[in-house]
Amino acid sequence: MFRDVLKTLPQYLIPKHGITALAGYFADVRNPRLKNFLIRNFIRKFDVDMSEALIEDPKSYDCFNDFFIRHLKPECRPLSQSDVICPVDGCISEIGKIERGQLLQAKGKYYSVQELLACDGQLAEQFVQGQFATLYLSPKDYHRVHMPIDAELVSMTYIPGALFSVQPATTRVVPKLFARNERLAIFFKTKIGPMVMVMVGATIVGAIGTSWHGDVKRSKKLERFDYSEQFSDKIISQGSEMGYFKLGSTVVLLFANGEKIQWDKELLAGSKVQLGKPMAIIT
């Protein structure tokens, strides 16, 4: 724990928003020499497997961000026949039941559904006995987010906040981390009731975006987007892309009807996961 504190302490002191803005600027630079340098060194440092990428040649990307949110070859992530599939590549931070409206962040640390979603008590009450899974995407992972189940898009809330790192050491130290960081809460209806996918920002995450909105503009104010009448077809099918991170972060998946979700028994905190693999069955 002492090492975790030492790693985390500087984050309280550095200008996280300024550093993130600067990183975002360089990630969008289209100068061939600079962007190729950034991409080449990132691949080397994190051992990125470019054979899975739809565009394998690193020099073919216009900028670092285009490389970072690269598409994969469909055959590299076949979709299982499971009722609920994993929406990302990454690892499980925590998974389990929402207890009296509280989600486990790390050992001994909790935060509430209401804090995470920045919503009223009536909405939070729907998830008070639900199920949740927190999925961490490391820098080397594929950074597009897909649908775990067929769902109807209802609304979206942009919630401004801090930009702490979401690496495991930070989650063990910073209280209510996921309810403090900038995030995007996306609300859906499914055949088993309400579902929310929360895309959590972090230090040097240049942008969070969705397939229907594009990059969500960073703001100091909470913003709500109502899609109840905006789209003629709001159903997004299982496995379809729904969003992306321009640099890595975390997805928190919540189901309101906890009695209907039975997580795969092999999924524990620390487990590696991959897009399309079985995640849960509906009982």
UniProtKB/Swiss-Prot annotation:
Uppermost EC category: lyase
Family: Belongs to the phosphatidylserine decarboxylase family. PSD-B subfamily. Prokaryotic type I sub-subfamily.
GO cellular component terms given for this protein: plasma membrane
Full protein name: Phosphatidylserine decarboxylase proenzyme
Keywords assigned by UniProt, alphabetized: Cell membrane, Decarboxylase, Lipid biosynthesis, Lipid metabolism, Lyase, Membrane, Phospholipid biosynthesis, Phospholipid metabolism, Pyruvate, Zymogen
Gene that encodes it: psd
InterPro entries xrefs: PS_Dcarbxylase (IPR003817), PSD-B (IPR033177), PSD_type1_pro (IPR033178)
Enzyme Commission no: 4.1.1.65
Catalyzed reactions: a 1,2-diacyl-sn-glycero-3-phospho-L-serine + H(+) = a 1,2-diacyl-sn-glycero-3-phosphoethanolamine + CO2
Keyword Lipid biosynthesis: yes
Subunit and interaction comment: Heterodimer of a large membrane-associated beta subunit and a small pyruvoyl-containing alpha subunit.
Pathway annotation from the record: Phospholipid metabolism; phosphatidylethanolamine biosynthesis; phosphatidylethanolamine from CDP-diacylglycerol: step 2/2
Species the sequence originates in: Legionella pneumophila (strain Paris)
Compartments (UniProt record): Cell membrane
One GO term of the biological process aspect: phosphatidylethanolamine biosynthetic process
GO MF annotation list: phosphatidylserine decarboxylase activity
Role description: Catalyzes the formation of phosphatidylethanolamine (PtdEtn) from phosphatidylserine (PtdSer).
Organism superkingdom: Bacteria
Species lineage: Bacteria, Pseudomonadati, Pseudomonadota, Gammaproteobacteria, Legionellales
Modified residues (Pyruvic acid (Ser)): 249
Residues of the site described as Cleavage (non-hydrolytic): 248-249
Record's bilayer topology term: Peripheral membrane protein
